[in-house]
């Protein structure tokens, strides 16, 4: 029977594994076929199959691939012809040899530096004068009376400038508090600080000092201070004080022909060439609490001291400007004066000749 059995070929699945064909026949023949399909024989068959596939010819055939042909690509000569045609239709624009303003300035002055100019460091104001500090009603009245007597003794002066400023507490919840401090300065060697926290009404001597006919009150945003003082102390009338006061920022714009709104700190930088320490810790401190500490007293004194310094400087500049304008008109006439004035001349410096 064995010689009539046909051995079926093995099948391979997609993974390359060989599956033996179904065994047919009697039990004896099936046992013989199982013995032939032992693991050793299977391993030999797989090794033979791998060796056949790894022959040099088969490897070269698998690796070698036909090179793809170039399609629809122009030859170098055709590309050059296309470029020449485009250049003929749209020739390249020639760069103008004329120098622009920016290139001319760079050529004359050199390439501008990318670094910004560092701001000038100014020295801080150091006040070494006296600070007279009063909190009681009678003390404030006596001090104001002493200042009035000193003003009356200045017989050679028609106007006595007096720096004026105020301080009050501020809260982001409740807003500005009641006027707490008034500081004045008529002489750079002494500043007066009056704390109003205990007062329900301003002393008559202090009101008389503010309304003295020879006193010219000055400060920055001083009109708003007078209006607030009137709201907090109705015995003070703001209108007469506003009429005779001088706002240093407005006066600076008139003399120096500048523009914009000024703060006391900026005026100190521009006019006096000094820096002010406007620390928020002191500026927003409790000005209504008695007594004031040293930092608060120095802050209040410096405000009116530097105000008096700025006033003196602007006063001197105004005199020089008026004198220069008069001399120029006398030498060159009104027409030349108007022409030069239209060009932005401030006449803060002396000008003797002009060419138009």
Curated annotation (Swiss-Prot):
Residues holding Mg(2+) 1: 165, 167, 303
Residues covered by region (Disordered): 1-120
Modified residues (Phosphoserine): 105, 113
One function term, GO molecular function aspect: 3'-5' exonuclease activity
Entries under InterPro entries matching the protein: 3'-5'_exonuclease_dom, 3-5_Exonuclease_domain, RNaseH-like_sf, RNaseH_sf
Biased composition (Basic and acidic residues): 29-56, 71-85
Compositionally biased intervals (Low complexity): 99-113
Alphabetized SMART domains for the sequence: 35EXOc (SM00474)
Annotated residues for binding of Mg(2+) 2: 165
CDD domains per UniProt: WRN_exo
Annotated SUPFAM superfamilies: Ribonuclease H-like (SSF53098)
Enzyme Commission identifier(s): 3.1.11.-
A GO cellular-component term linked to this record: nucleus
Major localization class: nucleus
The 3'-5' exonuclease domain, residue ranges: 155-316
Function: Has exonuclease activity on both single-stranded and duplex templates bearing overhangs, but not blunt ended duplex DNA, and cleaves in a 3'-5' direction. Essential for the formation of DNA replication focal centers. Has an important role in maintaining genome stability.
Family: Belongs to the WRNexo family.
Protein name, UniProt field: 3'-5' exonuclease
Gene: WRNexo
